[in-house]
Amino acid sequence: MTKTILGVLSLLVIMSCSIPVKENTVQPNIMETNKKNLGNLLALYPKPMTVVGAEVEGKVNWLVVGHTGVIGHDRILISMSKSHYTNQGIKDSKRLSVNLVSREILPKADYVGSVSGATVDKSEVFAYHIGENGTPVIDASPLTMECEVVDIYETEGFDNFICAIVNTYAAPEVLDNNGKLDYTKLKPVLFEFPTYSYLATGE
């Protein structure tokens, strides 16, 4: 009887060893998706196209800047390549203007973004006046912010100007009946960097 029991137990052990064990191939917390991974592509576009105005070596200069951002509720970021002629003027004066671009002034904005102030006098491309904070304000821009530079954060190849907004000027046609800014009327030109394309708001 004892031999029979031992034989049965031995047979069970052999059978259990011969049964293949399936590996757990399920990876928890990984969701299947049909989205394509584009790597570390910077894709925060389109952005409002702006023309930055500043005084450089005693003369007004204009520069198209597509890399701008909001910091908190009273600061903006203006990110500019270190190679730009305008940077030194901003560093010296610690002030600049940020002018939004409408369709009407897009050709002139495109021009000032394609030539350097180091070799071309761009001071008279736009009709302008000097704002209350001493920066050049484009008359035909639908909205302009005069800013003071409160800090400069340098990254590889770029000067990143942290700016406090001092004055904001808006054209009458972009205001509502209460004199407040109406963003549905503003409709600035947008800029898309990878293909250097201009887009119309809402289109």
Mark where each language-model region is.
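Short linear, low-complexity motifs centered on an aromatic residue
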Residues: 1-2, 127
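Sec-dependent signal peptide recognition
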Residues: 2-8
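A ubiquitous, low-specificity "background" feature that marks scattered single residues
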Residues: 8-9, 184
